[in-house]
Amino acid sequence: MIGDILLFGTLLMNAGAVLNFKLKKKDTQGFGEESREPSTGDNIREFLLSLRYFRIFIALWNVFMMLCMIVLFGS
């Protein structure tokens, strides 16, 4: 059960890190524009952009998970 949850989280993190979309921040149109609460789409975009910066740590996590799957969860 724990191995399945760790594997699911690892695969989900990998999928987010390797997305190759052109995600850009929305530009402000003028000086008078009031700041608004970021939408859900903006939050998802920021999260995916931040995952790109952590690719090396995600790769190290993948190696760690492979070792755990062999040592701990292997039969």
Curated annotation (Swiss-Prot):
All ranges on the Extracellular side of the membrane: 18-53
Signal peptide residues on this chain, from the entry's feature table: 1-17
InterPro entries the UniProt entry points to: SMIM7
Key words, A-Z: Membrane, Signal, Transmembrane, Transmembrane helix
Residue intervals on the Cytoplasmic side: 75
Membrane topology: Single-pass type I membrane protein
GO cellular-component term (any): membrane
Source organism superkingdom: Eukaryota
Residues that span the membrane, as ranges: 54-74
Localization per record: Membrane
Homology family: Belongs to the SMIM7 family.
Record PANTHER family: SMALL INTEGRAL MEMBRANE PROTEIN 7
Protein name: Small integral membrane protein 7
